[in-house]
Amino acid sequence: MQYWRLALALSAGLWSVAAAHAQPVEYEVLATTGELGPGMPPGWRFTRFDQPFVDELGRVTFLAQFNSGQAVYRTTGIDPQVLVRTGETPPGYEAGDELGSIRSLDHVNRAGDVGLEAWIEFGDSSPTLLGTWTYKDDAGLRGVSFGGLRAPGTTSVMCSGQAHWYEYLMSNAGHVAIYNHLCGTGGNDRQGIWASDENGENLRLVILENRPTEILPNTDVVFFREPQSINSQGTVVFDAFLEGDGITEANDYVYCAWNAQNGYSVVAREGDPVPGFPPTVTYEQIEGVRVNDLGHTMVWATVEGPGISEAWDQVILSDRDGNGLEHVYREGMQAPQQPPGATISYISDVYFNNKSQIAFMSRVAGSSDYFWSEGGPPGLTFVARTGQSVPGFDEPYVLTSFQTYETGGGYGPEPVFTDSGRLVFLGEISTQPTDPTDTRRRYYISDAAGELRDILPPGTQLDVSSVPGSPDIRTVDGKSFRLAGSANDADQVAALAYFTDGSSAVVLVSYADACLADVNGDGNASPADFSAWVAAYNASASGCDQNGDGQCTPADFSAWVINYNNGC
């Protein structure tokens, strides 16, 4: 009878179902406030941690604070190991020169290379300098650039103090791109971008404000912002306003790519024809450009021309298929997994990973914000939207807004879009309409099974003890604002946990691969799971959706067979 019902169901269409089994999650506490700091003087205990990062080897790097100093640690599977600490002489410096306060730990790339800002204090009483440093396993700690020292390619010096305008990026190979201003004689507070080689050495001038440029013939650069991206080949992407021959308000804004081997190339320019559209359709406003480690480019822009209206004037282009820039997504398109006629509008915050997958935010015929991603099943899929219920709380909470980093805003890091297609993002939630003033900030990840997961749900109990047989259980505080530093392709997230007793810890959150074929949940893929899948199909229940398209259809039977043959 069960199989007869299955046959009827297969001919009856499809149902929306709950997502398949969520990925199992594990928590590993790596360091806790109050503990003695490994590799530090006797009695030095952790007092605070700053933003942690996880690399592709699953190693977590974090900045630890002590009462009398700081250290950058990396976990190695045993105890955290000190990479950099204050009070020591960096390689290449003289005895008496010491690393002073570490201002910030800013970057850890896929290979585990570190980017940080710190002061160097000189034993001969020379002025203390604030610099950008890198740490690589094969090269150790190196200074890349310092405020107060000459800026390469100029006769002026880098501004000191790393003011609000200062930004730098690090590639997955270790290149550094720096955005700063010039100070001192002849500096005139001009903007500049500089880039290093993969060891943080040989810093070169890329572009300087109010100076002739080779971007276009007979033009000067009058303004630009911080670099938008740098890839593992050292290609730096930035935007610029130009003036000079043939430059008007309609074509003075360009996005450029630069590297040490090939110099400049124009990626997109306002007023130029948009690839894939009639020649009369041009770029009105270029919102963003990224170049990934494969050398592929993504352009997000507003276009104008005959046949273009405000309802469909935003586009996302890419050359990822090897055919040059071409249209991938466009405002006005049908929104995936939404009712017919529900269309994408107001595209914003576009992300491009190193597999050339795209994720972005938009509206859908209303006031809700949606997050979409190519990281799950084939094609663009829904990740989250404002107004939806979120996991992690006993009482109903809804996602009220996505929050991304704003300089000085204190919101936290940008969403992470990993090369495995996961999205990690910060959201503001509340109990609207019950109590809209009860707002909290939480970090979420879209897991491999398509479920939205609170990275460290409130009430989670973690054993912070490092002594076998002597547990020390602490409870995650639901009101804490945490920084989730990064995520890797193995579905691991580095996070800070704040506990109800006021202590905190660095935690590695790992999501194991979900065994989709294990429909009955006994931990094994076995013939019994076929009967369980049939029952799930007939009930439109969790476990039916084996291909991750958010639906329960006949295609899921073939997907279950594939998942079963792949094993668990």
Regions from the PLM with identified roles:
Residues 1-3:
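N-terminal secretory signal peptides that target proteins for export/translocation
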Residues 5-16:
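Bacterial N-terminal signal peptides
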Residues 6, 51, 124, 516, ...:
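Exposed boundary/loop context
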Residues 8, 78, 98, 398, ...:
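Short linear sequence elements within intrinsically disordered, low-complexity coil regions
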Residues 18-20:
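Intrinsic low-complexity/disordered segments
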Residues 22-514:
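Conserved "turn/edge" positions that cap or connect secondary-structure elements
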Residues 511-568:
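Cellulosome-associated attachment modules in secreted, modular CAZymes
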